[in-house]
């Protein structure tokens, strides 16, 4: 067996299948751009879903890839086991209705055993198959020469996700030798069992049946191959190391952590070894995820990153690292992965900045949070319970930034659990909107429909013309072929030549009409058919439309004109965002309609008002410069050398369409644009907001829509000026004057309230009682707010010199409570914080504070008198 690096194994796999006629699919972004059902890209096949479910027909039915993936369903096991990871690479080869079992098995065996490739000893390989898969058995036994005793039949060797494609699978296992298990009485010591000796190398799935809704299985018209090989596991076998963490894919990060911490990996301390592994795994995940546009936050993908970083920080304390350091590992990850993922090193400064910022935020609260957690655990043990309440867990999350899973890990070490349901109840009360976690879902759907069968050619000519003579070459109604559509009927059709743009790249579809003698057909929408043609959704308004009919296709030019203004404006906006906010900004989604444009982009903070103003002005300056928009076809490599922006998640062919706005903007884009920026007229931002997980959104209008918006705003300004009895240019002066008047009135009101408070405080001194030699005053008073309550408390403490005072007021059915204890009584054990907590609890509230002054709130005004009566009991209890 050869000595290979992880990078060499990856490249060798791709080279092998390229020799077998496969197209190499680039590794897609970890953030899914075309599949809202996925939180992360979680497998090699996840990015190929569009091919397997028939929505898109691939140019080459043979595909291979090395796909970066994230799975987060068992984070708590990372570091504890030899092979659990949150970030991993899946190597795969796929067939979309082309080759099947014999080729898949033959090539897998060749790659693993040939001296030209991996060069495994055949005697160390075993395979598992489904008990009824005789075809696979025959191929393995008779053609590959694997003896019967090393072909194990297992019931679980059947890939099935419910409805949709399914089929048997075969797995290949490598025997690492007796050092990893030699107790043959162990019922799990076999290929496919839970053991460390026989490691799964490769899983080949033979997708040959359709699992129908009624539970039956029928053969698929086209059989598919879907295989997966984990790069990290394969590397551990080739490099003959005990765990994936001991490979060259992880050891550089572990080595850097050794240098930072002064501790040693594999020095006999299993707890420290676990910390090294957690840090190495989590920094890989965070580095790649941030590089692909995800940012730490409290929801969705951002929450996963925050949880991983904070878990790593928590484990770093076991290595005596008490400062931000994870950001220093980002360039180390980049160096390890640079052969296949050069973009990590290109973005390392930005990624490190994001990681450092998140580390610093957590370090600010970590010490206090751990102290609070220690108190909570100690209190629970005193109360003879092994459960940390949901309220306490939520407080740790909300105030100290402890993800619930982190609290659960701390609790587990203390032999306790967390009331997760109680935590969720507290979350539900607190959050303003539902944050339902999306689950990773299965990768394929039911195959079917006639659209995938339509192979007739169709040419889009809409870049240069708005009307053309065409022929209807395919006509579909209710998912089936049809020869005609009557007036009032809806259907789908394909034209041999069409000026109608199909929705893509965020740009909405054209609309318009198809006209013939006595026939008028409304084109409502246009989408891409599975084989790439423009598929028109239509409704017949007049006459009968027949297949092969000659029609005149005419787009709505007024609608198109507004759309192209907004589309070119998004390109200008994209570049302006990079110029103002930084090169880390990347498009995360867009919508271009005739009325407005919406642009989503990666950014880790709110865009400030002055930044928005600068961005808006930059875009308008480019419009006013009347720059020609040039569109050309270029080879992909030439376009990239020119500096053209390629968008995350987009797949490009060998020849791409380049949209260039002077020397300012250069993007790969298949959309429609203005000929000159002057056509846009004017650009106006109407909103900027966060849409979660480090993604911001700008909404804007151009042309007529921008004019109408500004006209409306001028109208509102005039109306407001009229109500203030001034003119628009003087409205700010008028507003400043009104604010000054209000401020003066507030000042006079506060002065009057203070005087009244002082008078009431003087009257209250007559109500002071002596309890066990201590002056006690507990009274309900009439004041406007807590500030007035504090003023009154200060007056009373000064007047009484030595006293325990509790004041309560009721406003809008809410109770404010303030407790005060003079310095001489604090030394005797009296504590305002403890007292106010008890008083508040008796009128439906809570609170606390310092020994000398503390405040609280209550919800039940009717119980205030009863709550104040407790003050005497408290004084008696302390004086005993």
Curated annotation (Swiss-Prot):
Belongs to the class-II aminoacyl-tRNA synthetase family. The keyword Ligase applies. Zn(2+) binds at residues 567, 571, 669, 673. Its main location: cytoplasm. PANTHER family: ALANINE--TRNA LIGASE, CYTOPLASMIC (PTHR11777:SF9), ALANYL-TRNA SYNTHETASE (PTHR11777). The gene is alaS. This is Alanine--tRNA ligase. One of its GO terms (cellular component) is cytosol. GO terms for biological process: alanyl-tRNA aminoacylation. Consists of three domains; the N-terminal catalytic domain, the editing domain and the C-terminal C-Ala domain. The editing domain removes incorrectly charged amino acids, while the C-Ala domain, along with tRNA(Ala), serves as a bridge to cooperatively bring together the editing and aminoacylation centers thus stimulating deacylation of misacylated tRNAs. InterPro entries: aa-tRNA-synth_II/BPL/LPL (IPR045864), Ala-tRNA-lgiase_IIc (IPR002318), Ala-tRNA-ligase_IIc_anticod-bd (IPR018162), Ala-tRNA-synth_IIc_core (IPR018165), Ala-tRNA-synth_IIc_N (IPR018164), Ala-tRNA_ligase (IPR050058), Ala_tRNA_ligase_euk/bac (IPR023033), DHHA1_dom (IPR003156). GO terms for molecular function: alanine-tRNA ligase activity; aminoacyl-tRNA deacylase activity; ATP binding; catalytic activity, acting on a protein; transferase activity; tRNA binding; zinc ion binding. It comes from the Bacteria. The lineage of its organism: Bacteria, Bacillati, Bacillota, Bacilli, Bacillales.
């Amino acid at each position: 067996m050869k000595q290979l690096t992880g990078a060499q194994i990856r490249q060798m796999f791709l080279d092998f299948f390229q020799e077998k006629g496969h197209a190499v699919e680039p590794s897609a972004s970890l953030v899914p751009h075309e599949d809202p059902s996925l939180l992360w890209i979680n497998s090699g096949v996840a990015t190929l879903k569009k091919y397997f479910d028939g929505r898109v027909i691939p140019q080459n039915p043979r595909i291979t890839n090395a796909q970066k993936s994230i799975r987060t369903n068992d984070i708590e096991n990372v570091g504890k086991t030899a092979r659990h990871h949150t970030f991993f690479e899946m190597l795969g080869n796929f067939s979309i209705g082309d080759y099947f079992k014999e080729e898949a098995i033959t090539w897998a065996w060749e790659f693993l055993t040939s001296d030209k490739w991996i060069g495994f000893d055949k005697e160390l390989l075993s395979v598992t198959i489904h008990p009824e898969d005789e075809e696979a058995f025959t191929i393995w036994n008779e053609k590959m020469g694997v003896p019967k005793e090393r072909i194990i039949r297992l019931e679980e060797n059947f890939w099935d996700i419910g409805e949709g494609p399914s089929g048997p699978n075969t797995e290949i296992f490598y025997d690492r030798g007796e050092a990893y298990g030699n107790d043959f009485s162990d019922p799990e010591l076999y290929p496919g069992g839970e053991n460390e000796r026989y490691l799964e190398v490769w899983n080949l799935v033979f997708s040959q049946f359709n699992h129908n809704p009624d539970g039956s299985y029928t053969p698929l018209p086209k059989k598919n191959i879907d295989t997966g090989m984990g790069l990290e596991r394969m590397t551990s076998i080739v490099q003959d190391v005990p765990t994936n963490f001991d490979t060259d894919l992880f050891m550089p990060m572990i080595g850097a952590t050794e240098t930072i911490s002064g501790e040693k990996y594999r020095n006999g301390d299993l707890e420290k070894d676990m910390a090294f592994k957690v840090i190495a795994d989590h920094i890989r995940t965070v580095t790649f995820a941030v590089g692909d546009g995800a940012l730490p936050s409290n929801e969705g993908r951002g929450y996963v990153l925050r949880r991983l970083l904070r878990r790593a920080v928590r484990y770093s304390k076991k290595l005596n690292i008490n400062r931000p350091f994870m950001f220093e590992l980002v360039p180390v990850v980049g160096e390890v992965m640079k052969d296949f993922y050069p973009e990590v090193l290109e973005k390392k400064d930005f990624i490190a900045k994001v990681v450092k910022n998140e580390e610093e935020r957590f370090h600010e609260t970590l010490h206090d949070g751990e102290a609070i957690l220690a108190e909570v655990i100690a209190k629970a043990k005193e109360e003879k319970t092994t459960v940390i309440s949901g309220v306490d867990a939520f407080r740790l999350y909300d105030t100290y930034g402890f993800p619930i899973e982190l609290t659960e890990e701390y609790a587990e070490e203390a032999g306790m659990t967390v009331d997760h349901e109680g935590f969720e109840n507290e979350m539900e009360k607190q959050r303003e909107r539902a944050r339902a976690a999306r689950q990773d879902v299965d990768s394929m759907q039911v195959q079917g429909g006639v659209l995938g069968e339509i192979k007739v050619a169709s040419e889009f000519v809409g870049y240069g013309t708005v009307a053309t003579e065409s022929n209807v070459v395919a006509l579909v109604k209710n998912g089936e072929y049809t020869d005609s559509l009557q007036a009032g009927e809806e259907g789908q059709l394909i034209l041999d030549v069409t000026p109608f743009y199909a929705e893509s790249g965020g740009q909405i579809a054209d609309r318009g009409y198809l006209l013939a003698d006595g026939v008028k057909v409304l084109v409502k929408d246009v989408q891409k058919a599975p084989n790439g043609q423009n598929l028109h959704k239509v409704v017949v308004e007049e006459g009968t439309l027949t297949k092969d009919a000659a029609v005149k296709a005419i787009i709505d030019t007024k609608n198109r004109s507004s759309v192209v203004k907004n589309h070119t404006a998004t390109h200008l906006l994209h570049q302006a965002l990079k110029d103002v906010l930084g090169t880390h900004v990347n498009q995360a989604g867009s919508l271009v309609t005739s009325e407005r444009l919406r642009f989503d982009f990666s950014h880790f903070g709110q865009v400030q008002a002055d930044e928005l103003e600068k961005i808006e002005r930059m875009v308008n300056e480019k419009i006013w410069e009347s720059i020609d928009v040039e569109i050309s076809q270029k080879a992909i490599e030439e376009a990239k050398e020119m500096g053209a922006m390629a968008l995350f998640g987009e797949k490009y062919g060998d020849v791409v369409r380049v949209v260039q706005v002077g020397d300012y903007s250069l993007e790969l884009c298949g959309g429609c644009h203005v000929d000159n920026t002057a056509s846009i007229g004017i650009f106006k931002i109407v909103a900027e907001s966060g849409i979660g997980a480090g993604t911001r959104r700008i909404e804007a209008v151009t042309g007529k829509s921008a004019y109408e918006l500004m006209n409306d705003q001028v109208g509102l300004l005039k109306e407001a000026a009229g109500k203030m009895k001034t003119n628009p240019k003087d409205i700010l002066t008028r507003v400043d004057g009104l604010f000054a008047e209000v401020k003066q009135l507030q000042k006079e009101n506060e002065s009057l309230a203070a005087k009244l408070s002082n008078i009431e405080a003087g009257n209250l001194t007559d109500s002071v009682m002596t309890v066990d030699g201590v002056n006690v005053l507990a009274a309900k008073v009439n004041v406007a707010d807590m500030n007035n309550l504090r003023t009154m408390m200060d007056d009373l403490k000064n007047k009484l010199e030595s006293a325990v005072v509790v004041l309560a007021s009721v406003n809008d059915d809410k109770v404010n409570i303030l407790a005060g204890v003079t310095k001489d009584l604090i030394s005797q054990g009296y504590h305002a914080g403890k007292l106010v907590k008890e008083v508040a609890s008796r009128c439906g509230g809570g609170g606390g504070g310092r020994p000398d002054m503390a405040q609280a709130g209550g919800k039940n005004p009717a119980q205030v008198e009863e709550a104040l009566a407790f003050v005497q009991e408290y004084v008696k209890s302390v004086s005993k």
